[in-house]
Amino acid sequence: MPSELTPEERSELKNSIAEFHTYQLDPGSCSSLHAQRIHAPPELVWSIVRRFDKPQTYKHFIKSCSVEQNFEMRVGCTRDVIVISGLPANTSTERLDILDDERRVTGFSIIGGEHRLTNYKSVTTVHRFEKENRIWTVVLESYVVDMPEGNSEDDTRCFADTVVKLNLQKLATVAEAMARNSGDGSGSQVT
């Protein structure tokens, strides 16, 4: 359970963590779970996270993302990502595994490309919190991945954790700026 969460948040998120962010690990694989508190409405945060075709909106290390000409965002669709230089990756082909707008759950798998993240699967959930007339969002993101040959579990987790944490921080920055700029606190949504 991420240490960034308050006891109240932990209690409320327990079932979601059990359902979406708990993995049966095969030998040679590892997983991790991260949380990010965002001072913006969950509807706005979800409008960013759900855009499988525009991950560069909040993901740091993506140079570009392309989808098929007649792209339809649905489970099974794919995207081709070009990663910025300096990382141990060049390209990534990713498949949308889940997109549940009602429960605000999305997830993808890396199914090809030039990278070292074999069998990488990620799930992201967006959660609403309200207390004393304040509304905020907690985003949970978890992953499971095979450890590359020659890398330890710590090496693998350190790399993947760094990428996930930086992406979640950028998501918070983008969503909070959108909420501030909307003037009414509800925030505009990504279209």
Where are the regions that the model predicts?
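Glycine-rich portal/gate segments that line the openings of hydrophobic small-molecule binding cavities
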Residues: R50-T118
